[in-house]
């Protein structure tokens, strides 16, 4: 169920402060964050976020099509290496 419109999108306060400070100064530095739950808002356009995936920080450049999504959607937490092919020759021995 989506969030109520009267509440507005959720963005962590510390993250919003960092974005506002960079917008005022005009700098485009990487913002390191652990807040995967924060919604991407139009103020974040053009910024690069280093989103934590549990192991390392993944760089995510925000563009218009990402507005309304969560930061965590663009930093996958699981690495799928594929299924092992069944090797019949080694199984017989």
Curated annotation (Swiss-Prot):
Keywords: Ribonucleoprotein, Ribosomal protein, RNA-binding, rRNA-binding. Gene3D superfamilies: 30s Ribosomal Protein S19, Chain A (3.30.860.10). Disulfide bonds: none annotated. The keyword rRNA-binding applies. It comes from the Bacteria. One of its GO terms (cellular component) is cytoplasm. One of its GO terms (biological process) is translation. GO terms for molecular function: rRNA binding; structural constituent of ribosome. Protein S19 forms a complex with S13 that binds strongly to the 16S ribosomal RNA. NCBIfam families: rpsS_bact. Belongs to the universal ribosomal protein uS19 family. This is Small ribosomal subunit protein uS19.
């Amino acid at each position: 169920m989506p969030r109520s419109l009267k509440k507005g999108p959720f963005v962590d306060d510390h993250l919003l402060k960092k974005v506002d400070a960079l917008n005022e100064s005009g700098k485009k530095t990487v913002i390191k964050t652990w807040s995967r739950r924060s919604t991407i808002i139009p103020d974040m356009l053009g910024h690069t976020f280093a989103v934590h995936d549990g192991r390392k920080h993944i760089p995510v450049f925000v563009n218009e099509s990402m507005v309304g999504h969560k930061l965590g959607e663009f930093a996958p937490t699981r690495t799928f290496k594929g299924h092992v092919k069944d090797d019949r020759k080694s199984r017989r021995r």
